[in-house]
Structures are given as C-alpha cells and as structure tokens.
A protein has these predicted regions:
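N-terminal helix-cap/turn-to-beta initiation motif at the start of protein domains
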Residues: 1-8, 19-20
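Beta-sheet ligand-binding and adhesion/scaffold domains
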Residues: 9-16, 24, 49-88
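N-terminal glycine/threonine-rich, aromatic-flanked beta-hairpin/loop signature
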Residues: 12-50
Length: 88
C-alpha cells in the first residue's frame, strides 16, 4: 500500500512509521525523551465505516492524500513522507 513508510510532522510532532504486519497495518511512533533516548510505541490501525483509525486509546482519524502523498491525523496534524530514515 502507498501509505507504508516513514512519516514526519510538518509541525514538529513525533514522527512515525506505517507498516504491515500479519495482514494488519500498524504505526510505530518515535518520541525523544528528556534524557535524549528514543521511546517507541506501536498501535494497530483499524477501519470503521470506510475510515482509518489509529487505536491509541483515543480515536485518531488517519486520512491519506494520495495525490499530495500526505497523511492527516485528526488530532495530530499533517505529515509528509520522510526523505531519510527516522532515527531509532
């Protein structure tokens, strides 16, 4: 699927990787801690009524703009495809 890959926020929010595992799509977020280490969290993506949601405990709507190759998270803002691998 075209959405797979590394994504970075246009507004300095945590980056994420979208990937497929065992037939399910997942998102791993990367957040830098105050000590400078990278903390990761992985969430499953589900589909409800034709909409994609990241299951974080809250409903985070994920919309992919194929024409502009952008992802919009609501809440969370706009993400663009990363040109370089995310530091893990």
């Amino acid at each position: 699927r075209a959405m797979r890959g590394d994504w970075e926020s246009v507004k300095n929010r945590p980056a994420f990787t979208l990937f497929e595992e065992n037939g399910h799509y997942r998102v791993t977020t990367y957040r830098k801690t105050y000590r400078g280490t990278i903390q990761t969290e992985t969430y499953q993506i589900s589909e409800q009524d034709g909409n994609l949601f990241i299951e974080t405990g809250l409903s985070v709507l994920l919309t992919y703009d194929k024409e502009n190759d952008r992802i919009l998270l609501s809440p969370g803002g706009e993400y663009k495809r990363s040109n370089q691998p995310i530091k893990r």
